[in-house]
Amino acid sequence: MKKIIFALFFILAIVSCQTEKQGRTAPWSKEKANEWYKQWGWLRGCNFQPSTAINQLEMWQAESFDPVTVDRELGWAASIGMNCMRVYLHHVAWDVDKEGFKKRMGQYLGIADSHGISTIFVFFDDCWNPTYSAGKQPEPKPGIHNSGWVRDPGDLLFEKPELINLLETYMKDVLTYFKDDKRIVLWDLYNEPGNSAYGDKSMNLVQKAYECAWAVNPSQPVSIGLWNANLKEFNKVQLQNSDVITYHHYRDLATHQQVVDSLKPYGRPMICTEYMARHFNSTFQEIMPMLKAENVGAINWGFVAGKTNTIFKWSEPLPDMEEPPLWFHDILRKDGTPYSQEEVDTIKALCGK
């Protein structure tokens, strides 16, 4: 009898291992997600783009990859207590140089890890410019927020539906390569799906992104962030399929608290992967203490003011102004000095620095 029980246990163990290797068909359980979250403590940081890169392609292409700036600026982030960065990828940078792209991702992870910083990688994005190309990227347009940022895959997917096959290969290649990398906190599969008036056209890629991630079954959780309460079908799919709840919120403390309270019943860890817009009263002094108290990850938009021009407000160009009187995003100037010492003091105090 003992032999039979042992044999049955052994068979079940093999089946379990095979299932694990073959992928999964559902999100993590709440218990697994919450146990995963405990190991990280309170995640806080920013959406990181080195000040020398106008967009994802300039960050990741071989000719413009800038590890010196990355190292310097992540050192500044660590010095004020940040421990997690959200970083955008782009399939074109992978497509033109697959092995080099993954090598540079690894190099970035090594630099971040040397500063005690973990990483959330983002695959797709429905925001800003609809078209893009490999090679030299445009110079910033004065006073215009994110003048060179590019979507991924953008309009090209609707013009060439067969691109979905390349995107699947891209996702699976990157996820497989880094599936057990402990320097990666989470895979953010798609930034703000349905934005740029794409609406339901983005749903197919949302579903494909989850399928690809589940097929690879990385050791890290996957998520797609909530960002628009009116996109009810997207929100339903994202809440049903994400291991960890991620979301964006750029408004004041009262409305942000309402969002957090509305998501608590789902019983999963939460990370706010975009916040902090000074014009809308989404500030470090107001929002960050609440997020810490609620044990919600706090990832603001922007760190060092640079080529992205995100010190300027959305849709309010100021082409004749080098610097607006009130910065929209970002924390430090290019020399590492703060836009607001009060803000940096708040961040450091909350992070125990």
Residue ranges and their predicted role:
Residues L12-A26:
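Bacterial Sec-dependent signal peptides at the C-terminal "C-region" and cleavage site
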Residues I4-A13:
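Sec-dependent N-terminal signal peptides
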Residues A349-K353:
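Catalytic domains of carbohydrate-active enzymes that cleave complex glycans
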Residues G23-S242, H248, L253, Y266, ...:
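Active-site mouth of glycoside hydrolases
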